[in-house]
């Protein structure tokens, strides 16, 4: 990770600030308490959130909101993280949070943003937003106070904190979790044992149920045998019953056949009677048809005579009608023509009156237009164009504006002269001024003022006159356009009036022609009015005779048709020639023959009815025997069903018991398996975790000691003095083979030990977490250093090979080691950052 920029707003002592970071060594220098460490805390807050600290420890006391924006790169990819703090009724909480990557802004919650940052940095840590980043705190940035507290803390506290830094707590957590799991498994195993305590009792209960079931199955087997014998006897009796039943069916069939034959005989008798009645009806209808045929013949002859008489009268009237038809046609044509001429005449008279009214209206309208044209032609041309007048107005307005400016200057001079006259001293040179000179100046200025004001008034009057002229020009242009439109309208109206007069003349000529035709039609109608009346009378009489002729013809046709029907029917009804009559006689003979045959069959069936009582008695006895055997069989079946129910109940009980026994066996088996797990956890896994932690801690101690000694030798050039750490990571200083208390060391030596301890811790944590960090942050690492020790820091930086190192110090001598220098100062409680190198 490489930091590129940091922006703060209302964070601790900062109202606002921005820092640009580059590769190399960046130094933040300033007095103690100026706000240098706040920058480092802001970086940590931007990356990981508040952690276990309170929001009001970061938010400026006088502000209700603040924010930090951090831009950094990882593997060449740039990211920007933004976190906001807001003060509310419940305290200071995080507000808007987002991350920008690949140009896309994504708003997240505190937990989601921390997870995103940890994934980008490759830190494998818990996602709890209220926990600090262990890797960052020990591999990148360790505050000065925290490092001193680690070194000076009691050994148990120091070991506990270093175990967290080295992530060795996972072994003790694993052992503690194993203990919890072991206790839970033991409780589960004991619970399973309790649930399977009565397994042997259940087995004995199962054996008893199996014995009872065996006895019931033996009883069922005997009942099956008894039922089988009874059903065989029932089958034998039913076979005998079937023989008797067939005989009974034969008797019942004979009874039904006798009844059927008797019904058929009765039907045949009824049929013969109907046939004889039908023949008598045919003979009667034959006689009636002969009488009706004679009557129809008489009526037909009378109708034919009447029809012949009507035909002669119709022929005479048709001759008369032909002679009157031509006169009647001419009369109708003359009447139609007369009505059409009258209608057209009325329409033409009305149209003529309308045209006369329209012509009168057009003449009045054209007179009014001519009068208006004469009035508008009297309007005189002003003699100027609008552009000319507008140019004149603009010129006058410019002159007025210039004069007003001059008038303003004159007013100022008059006020100055009056002021000098009152004071008697020139405000520019502070010399006395002659009053006469000032009075002359005042008179001259006032005279010029009056002249200018008079000229302005004249110019304004002239502008007003030109505006009036503009109105007259506009009025003249409007009148010219309106005059053009009126002349065009007048021309159209005159042409329209001329067309209407021509139409009126045409209508008057047509009226004269219609009146002549009307007189001719009236004369012809008068001559032919009697011919039409005579023709209508003949037409009416002819129509009446034809209707009578049609009626007689219909009656004659009906009489002829009825006679044809009667002749056909007489032929059909003649007993000598009628097929139906002869067929009826034949069917009567056949019915008598069939009746004799059916009576013979009745006598045959009556022989079969003699043994009916004997068959019915045998059937009754067999039915009683079968019923008794079936009752016995049903009793046996009921007993067998009861036994089967008991067997099923026993089988259900056995199944439930076997299932319960199987479950209890599984519970006991599972309890023993869980007991084995408890033994493995307590006797093998938990001790192994302790051994692994001890072994890993020893390896870390060895590596830490080597790095601690290496960095101390670089910082302290004293061959007689050496350092090491014991098994509790306590730093031990030896001088010429004797241990030396840390309290007796110089300030520079104690700082060297703390810095060497910090660098060793950073490098070990980086290796253990497999995090390759390109950045190192050191907070006040040189307190008490000599100049020689300060210069040795450059060797340490070169050996660390970090792309970016951030130093916070109040030592100005570190400027020689820094590539980029920022000065932090505090004024009136507000910190300010300024780049100085």
From Swiss-Prot:
GO terms for molecular function: ATP binding; ATP hydrolysis activity; zinc ion binding. Zn(2+) binds at residues 426, 429. Its cofactor is Zn(2+). Keywords: ATP-binding, Coiled coil, DNA damage, DNA repair, Hydrolase, Metal-binding, Nucleotide-binding, Zinc. GO terms for biological process: double-strand break repair. The keyword Zinc applies. ATP binds at residues 12, 144. Residues 379-478 form the Zinc-hook domain. Binds 1 zinc ion per homodimer. Residues 197-419, 462-551, 634-673 form a coiled coil. Pfam families: AAA_23. Gene3D superfamilies: 1.10.287.1490, Helix hairpin bin, P-loop containing nucleotide triphosphate hydrolases. The two conserved Cys that bind zinc constitute the zinc-hook, which separates the large intramolecular coiled coil regions. The 2 Cys residues coordinate one molecule of zinc with the help of the 2 Cys residues of the zinc-hook of another Rad50 molecule, thereby forming a V-shaped homodimer. Belongs to the SMC family. RAD50 subfamily. Part of the Rad50/Mre11 complex, which is involved in the early steps of DNA double-strand break (DSB) repair. The complex may facilitate opening of the processed DNA ends to aid in the recruitment of HerA and NurA. Rad50 controls the balance between DNA end bridging and DNA resection via ATP-dependent structural rearrangements of the Rad50/Mre11 complex. Homodimer. Forms a heterotetramer composed of two Mre11 subunits and two Rad50 subunits. This is DNA double-strand break repair Rad50 ATPase.
């Amino acid at each position: 990770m490489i930091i590129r920029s940091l922006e703060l707003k209302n964070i601790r002592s900062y109202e606002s600030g921005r820092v640009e970071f580059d590769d190399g060594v960046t130094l933040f220098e300033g007095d103690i308490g100026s706000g240098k460490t706040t920058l480092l805390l802001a970086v940590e807050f931007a990356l990981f959130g508040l952690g276990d600290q309170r929001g009001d420890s970061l938010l400026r006391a006088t502000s209700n909101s603040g924010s930090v924006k951090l831009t950094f790169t990882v593997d060449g990819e740039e990211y920007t993280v933004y976190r906001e703090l807001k003060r509310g009724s419940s305290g200071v909480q995080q507000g808007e949070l987002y991350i920008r990557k690949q140009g896309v802004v994504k708003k997240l919650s505190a937990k989601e943003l921390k997870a995103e940052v940890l994934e980008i940095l490759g830190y494998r840590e818990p996602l709890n937003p209220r926990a600090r980043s262990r890797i960052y705190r020990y591999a990148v940035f360790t505050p000065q106070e925290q490092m001193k507290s680690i070194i000076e803390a009691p050994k148990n506290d120091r070991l506990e904190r270093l175990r967290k830094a080295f992530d060795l707590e996972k072994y003790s957590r694993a052992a503690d979790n194993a203990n919890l799991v072991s206790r839970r498994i033991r409780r589960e195993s004991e619970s399973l044992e309790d649930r399977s305590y009565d397994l042997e009792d259940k087995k004995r209960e199962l054996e008893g149920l199996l014995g009872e079931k065996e006895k019931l199955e033996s009883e069922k087997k005997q009942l099956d045998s008894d039922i089988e014998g009874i059903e065989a006897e029932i089958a034998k009796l039913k076979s005998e019953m079937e023989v008797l039943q067939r005989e009974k069916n034969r008797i019942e069939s004979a009874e039904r056949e006798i009844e059927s034959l008797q019904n058929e005989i009765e039907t045949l008798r009824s049929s013969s009677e109907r046939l004889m009645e039908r023949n008598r009806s045919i003979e009667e209808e034959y006689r009636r048809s002969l009488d009706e045929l004679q009557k129809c013949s008489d009526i037909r002859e009378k109708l034919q005579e009447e029809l012949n008489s009507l035909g002669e009268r119709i022929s005479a009237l048709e001759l008369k009608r032909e002679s009157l038809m031509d006169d009647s046609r001419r009369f109708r044509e003359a009447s139609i023509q007369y009505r059409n001429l009258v209608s057209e005449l009325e329409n033409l008279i009305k149209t003529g009156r309308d045209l006369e009214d329209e012509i009168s209206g057009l003449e009045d309208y054209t007179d009014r237009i001519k009068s208006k044209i004469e009035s508008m032609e009297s309007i005189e041309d002003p003699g100027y164009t609008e552009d000319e007048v507008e140019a004149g107005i603009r010129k006058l307005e410019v002159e007025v504006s210039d004069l007003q400016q001059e008038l303003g200057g004159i007013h100022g001079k008059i006020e100055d002269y009056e002021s000098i006259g009152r004071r008697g001293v020139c405000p520019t040179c502070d010399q006395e001024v002659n009053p006469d000179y000032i009075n002359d100046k005042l008179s001259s200025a006032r005279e010029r003022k009056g002249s200018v004001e008079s000229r302005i008034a004249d110019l304004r009057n002239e502008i007003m006159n030109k505006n009036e002229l503009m109105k007259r020009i506009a009025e003249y242009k409007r009148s010219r356009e309106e005059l053009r439109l009126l002349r065009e309208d007048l021309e159209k109206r005159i042409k329209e009036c001329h067309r209407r007069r021509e139409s009126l003349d045409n209508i008057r000529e047509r009226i004269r022609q219609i009146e002549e035709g009307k007189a001719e039609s009236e004369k012809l109608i008068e001559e032919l009015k009697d011919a039409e009346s005579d023709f209508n009378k003949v037409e009416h009489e002819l129509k009446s005779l034809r209707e009578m002729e049609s009626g007689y013809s219909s009656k004659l046709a009906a009489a002829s048709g009825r006679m044809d029907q009667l002749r056909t029917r007489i032929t059909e009804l003649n007993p000598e020639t009628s097929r139906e009559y002869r067929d009826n006689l034949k069917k009567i003979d056949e019915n008598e023959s069939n009746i004799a045959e059916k009576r013979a069959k009745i006598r045959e069936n009556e022989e079969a009815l003699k043994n009916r009582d004997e068959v019915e008695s045998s059937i009754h006895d067999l039915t009683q025997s079968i019923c008794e055997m079936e009752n016995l069989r049903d009793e046996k079946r009921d007993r067998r069903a009861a036994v089967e129910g008991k067997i099923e109940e026993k089988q259900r009980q056995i199944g439930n018991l076997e299932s319960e026994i199987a479950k209890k066996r599984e519970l006991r088996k599972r309890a023993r398996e869980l007991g084995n797990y408890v033994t493995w956890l307590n006797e093998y896994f938990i001790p192994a975790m302790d051994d692994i932690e001890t072994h890993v801690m020893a390896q870390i101690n060895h590596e830490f000691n080597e790095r601690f000694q290496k960095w101390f030798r670089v910082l302290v050039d004293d061959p007689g003095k050496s350092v090491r750490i014991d098994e509790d990571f306590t730093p031990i200083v030896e001088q010429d083979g004797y241990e030396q208390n840390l309290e007796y060391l110089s300030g520079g030596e104690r700082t060297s030990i703390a810095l060497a301890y910090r660098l060793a811790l950073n490098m070990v944590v980086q290796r253990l977490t497999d995090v390759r960090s390109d950045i190192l942050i050191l907070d006040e690492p040189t307190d008490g250093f000599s100049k020689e020790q300060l210069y040795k820091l450059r060797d340490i930086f070169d050996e660390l090979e970090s792309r970016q190192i951030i130093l916070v110090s109040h030592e100005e001598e570190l400027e020689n080691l820094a590539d980029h220098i920022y000065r932090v100062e505090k004024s009136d409680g507000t910190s300010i950052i300024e780049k100085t190198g």
